């Protein structure tokens, strides 16, 4: 094994899979160099079943080439683009923190309201990053016409040190693309779409301004701007529905903040803010008039207050990755292995009864999976389960059924493991 807990993936060591979506897997990884140089990064790797689809691979590569041209403190940095065996990947900046779709609910559960002034501070940084991307030019001064098209709470990340990053310019549209997205194709999260996006029209940067307005509206009022029983109902609401002033839901919304939101949310884009810089200027003007303006330090302290347990678990995971020289793993290429454990602190597998425990006895006299002891800390802490899989068809099938039965968080990874082994066994 080339390094602790993971597999060599070119010049990188994969440490843990931290997310998976329809398009790609995201791995926490380490880049190593001369004289002990190390850098923690993220690897975004196309999922195996998509690597053979030529059109998708081309879209992925075009996305990476576009995103790699963005270099701004408010945008996640792309470091590398490559292919190892049949796996295409992007190496990108690792940001220890949480996205806003997790921060606000976590604060609410802790009984700590998320201050509106913090929401405005974050939105100002989003505006700055968007304006940079929207006005980005190539080496010859030609505009790239970048539009993010998916500004949502999930794509706005705040690090533990209080810095804000826009993530996933993955469905950005630019003239640099080899093939333009079909005109009527709708992408992005429905509830934050601009009216022109919902109608499948050609987009420009003002669509992102509307989406940010929808996000900020939700943070300020506590209500999602567009809702509906199904996708068509949401789209109809975006196109035809009335947008109520924020004070309709929350009486104490300052008049200046309400003006900012209503201008950003103009359905006619000609009446909207014409640049993200204009929106940022109005937000910053309001913040300057307040008795208190939050800094990155204030945001950092707020996050540490509500995420203290998760921050410690992530530190422990990184330290453990350094200590452990060998880990049970799955094959990834020639003699490359990856441990089956996710960063979020959930077990890969529990016992057949649903309670964490001994994994040796799955089904009475049925197939057995050899295991090392499982250690359990206090409720909600990281549950470690290390498995050594016996390479027999019955045992693998039993493990597959167990993962399916309990709908475990890393089930996609378990499925891929089992499919790979079953294919190998013939």
Question: Which residues are covered by each model-predicted region?
Answer:
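Hydrophobic recognition helices of helix-based DNA-binding modules
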Residues: 130, 134, 283, 421-425
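Short Lys/Arg-rich basic patches
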Residues: 364-391, 400-403
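Conserved ATP-binding/catalytic core of the eukaryotic-like protein kinase fold
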Residues: 1-244
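Short N-terminal regulatory/linker segments that flank and modulate the kinase catalytic core
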Residues: 1-16, 36, 110, 286, ...
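Surface-exposed, Lys/Arg-rich phosphate-binding patches that contact polyanionic backbones
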Residues: 393-412
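C-terminal lobe helix-coil module of Hanks-type protein kinase domains
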Residues: 154-157, 167, 191-342, 349
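Short, basic amphipathic alpha-helical segments that act as recognition/interaction helices
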Residues: 408-426
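Residues that scaffold the ATP/ADP-binding catalytic core of kinase and kinase-like folds
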Residues: 103, 174, 237, 286, ...
């Amino acid at each position: 094994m080339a390094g602790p807990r993971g597999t060599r993936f070119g010049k990188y060591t994969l440490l843990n899979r931290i997310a998976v979506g329809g398009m790609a897997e995201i791995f926490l990884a380490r880049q190593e160099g001369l004289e002990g140089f190390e850098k923690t990064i993220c690897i975004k790797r196309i999922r195996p079943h998509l690597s053979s689809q030529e059109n998708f691979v081309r879209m992925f590569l075009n996305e990476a080439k576009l995103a790699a041209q963005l270099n701004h403190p408010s945008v996640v940095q792309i470091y590398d683009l490559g292919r190892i065996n049949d796996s295409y990947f992007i190496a990108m900046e690792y940001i220890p923190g949480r996205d806003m779709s997790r921060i606000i609910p976590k604060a609410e559960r802790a009984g700590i309201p998320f201050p509106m002034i913090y929401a405005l501070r974050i939105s100002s940084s989003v505006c700055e990053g968007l304006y940079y991307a929207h006005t980005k030019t190539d080496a010859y001064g030609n505009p790239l016409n970048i539009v993010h098209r998916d500004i949502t709470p999930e794509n706005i990340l705040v690090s533990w040190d209080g810095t804000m990053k826009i993530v996933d310019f993955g469905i950005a549209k630019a003239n640099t693309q080899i093939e333009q997205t079909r005109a009527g194709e709708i992408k992005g999260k429905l509830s934050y779409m601009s009216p022109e996006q919902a109608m499948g029209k050609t987009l420009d940067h003002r669509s992102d301004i509307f989406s940010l307005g929808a996000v900020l509206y939700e943070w300020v009022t506590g209500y999602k701007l567009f809702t509906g029983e199904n996708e068509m109902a949401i789209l109809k609401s975006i196109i035809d529905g009335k947008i109520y002033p924020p004070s309709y839901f929350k009486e104490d919304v300052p008049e200046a903040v309400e003006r900012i939101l209503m201008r950003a949310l103009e359905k006619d884009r000609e009446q909207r803010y014409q640049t993200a810089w204009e929106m940022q200027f109005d937000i910053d003007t309001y913040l300057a008039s307040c008795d208190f303006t939050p800094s990155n330090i204030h945001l950092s302290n707020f996050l540490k207050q509500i995420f203290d347990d998760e921050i410690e678990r992530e530190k422990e995971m990184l330290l453990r990755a350094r200590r452990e020289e060998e880990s049970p793993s799955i094959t990834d290429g020639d003699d490359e292995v990856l441990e089956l454990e996710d960063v979020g602190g959930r077990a890969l597998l529990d016992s057949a009864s649903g309670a964490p425990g001994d994994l040796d006895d799955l089904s009475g006299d049925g197939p057995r999976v050899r295991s090392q002891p499982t250690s359990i800390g206090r409720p909600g802490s990281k549950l470690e389960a290390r498995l050594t899989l016996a390479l027999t068809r019955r045992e693998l099938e039993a493990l597959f059924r167990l993962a399916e039965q309990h709908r475990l968080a890393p089930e996609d990874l378990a499925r891929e493991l089992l499919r790979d082994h079953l294919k190998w066994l013939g």
